[in-house]
Amino acid sequence: MCIRDSLQSEQIRSRIDEFGGKLYLEFGGKIFDDYHASRVLPGFLPDSKMKMLIELKDEAEMIIAINANDIEKSKVRGDIGITYDLDVLRLIDIYSSFGLVVRSVVLTQYNSQPLAKAFSEKLNSLGIDVYRHYAIDNYPTDVKLVVSDDGYGKNDFIKTEKSLVVVTAPGPGSGKMAVSVSYTHLRAH
């Protein structure tokens, strides 16, 4: 563990306390094997994020977001050549192998898509809770609608137990930030 990882972990713990014992952290980019970031960011190692999370594993749980439309289109990760849904299963295995708790997957932009429903059933059979977040018309510009019962209010509330909730995804456009904001909105109401 490098000093930087320990400092980041301490800052996260401080933020957990600052925000009343619960922090939602949206992790963009790769959590491990981030060779691009290690090339362009001085001092950043390919596994810096993972090392920090391992240090926080007793306090953290992972939520993985995946866009239901990406499941339906069989969207493929260009770097490793597998579909986003298969990558969710891979990420669950990898995070779990490092002792990180993964008990939830959120299907974003959900509209009862057939392949998304099948994927939900597969996750349930593996003991993973599945939550649905629905498309919101005029998101994010119609703030009044977004924060109403017909916006974030219609999304499933994600049950969490740990003080640090890390929201991640197989790739961009999966809805990580929307899941984080929706979750904090639902928790407040």
Across the structure, where does each feature detected by a protein language model lie?
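Glycine-rich phosphate-binding P-loop
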Residues: 165-185
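Structural beta-strand/beta-sheet cores of well-ordered domains, especially the beta-sheet scaffolds
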Residues: 21-23, 163, 179
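A short, structured active-site edge motif that brings together acidic residues
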Residues: 134-136
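Phosphate-binding P-loop
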Residues: 157-162
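Short, well-ordered, mixed-charge alpha-helical segments that flank or form enzyme active sites
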Residues: 72-73, 112-115, 138-142, 174-175
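Long, basic/Gly/Ser/Thr-rich N-terminal segments
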Residues: 4-132
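N-terminal pre-Walker A segment at the start of P-loop NTPase domains
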Residues: 138-152
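Conserved small/polar residues in nucleotide/adenosyl-binding loops
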Residues: 1-5, 184-189
